[in-house]
Design a protein with these regions (language model features):
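Short hydrophobic/aromatic-rich motifs at helix boundaries and adjacent loops
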Residues: 25-29, 103-108, 132-137
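Detector for Asparagine
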Residues: 26, 31, 65, 82-83, ...
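Active-site lumenal/periplasmic loops and adjacent helix-entry segments of GT-C-fold
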Residues: 113-176
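Generic signal for short, ordered secondary-structure residues
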Residues: 2-3, 36-37, 107, 113-114, ...
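Internal/C-terminal transmembrane anchor helices
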Residues: 97-118
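Membrane-embedded, hydrophobic transmembrane alpha-helices
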Residues: 1-94
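A generic short alpha-helical patch detector that favors 3-5-residue windows
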Residues: 45, 49, 103-107, 155
Length: 176
């Protein structure tokens, strides 16, 4: 269950991050990227950064729930109507499947790393210290002003935690 939920959630994050990043790259007319996969990676990081910062901003007024990824996914569906974004995505998809050895190797690497990560214990001290608590708090209450006065670990706020907090509901709760 955990492995499938992680694969699904990362697919969802890719789905709403890449078109948003491509929109930004197309608005700024970025054409110096020689390889198409470089543009894919950069558009993913731009998209997920924008999503994380928007969610961090909105967490002051709203609880981080599963409606945020739904709204970003609907916006991504709207962005897929753009011809430039659609052509970039179809070009990547064709290149990925034409180079079957890279695709099969990537799938094997992805699955083996997921199996390794899911079967190894979490040894990071700070994960249990404030990451998990912060994610739980954001998914249940959003930003609460003055919460750091209770304990200093609660005062750490990360935009990446807001992305995870929006996905920490229902079937996926405590699975990521």
């Amino acid at each position: 269950k955990i492995m499938l939920s992680i694969i699904f959630l990362w697919g969802l994050i890719l789905f709403f991050s890449v078109p948003l990043g491509l929109l930004v790259l197309n608005i700024f007319k970025v054409n110096f990227l020689s390889r198409s996969f470089d543009k894919f990676i950069i558009s993913f990081w731009i998209g997920i950064s924008i999503v994380a910062l928007i969610q961090l901003f909105l967490s002051g007024w709203f609880v981080m729930n599963f409606w945020f990824p739904v709204v970003f996914s609907l916006f991504s569906l709207f962005l897929l109507k753009n011809n430039l974004i659609k052509s970039d995505l179809s070009q990547w998809w064709k290149n990925l499947f034409f180079q079957k050895s890279i695709f099969v190797g990537g799938i094997i690497l992805l699955l083996s790393s997921i199996f390794y990560m899911l079967n190894s214990p979490i040894v990071w001290d700070d994960t249990g210290g404030y990451h998990i608590g912060n994610i739980e708090w954001l998914s249940q209450y959003g930003i609460t002003y003055g919460i750091a006065l209770i304990h200093n670990r609660l005062g750490i706020l990360s935009s990446w935690n807001t992305v995870i907090a929006t996905l920490n509901h229902g079937l996926f709760e405590h699975s990521i």
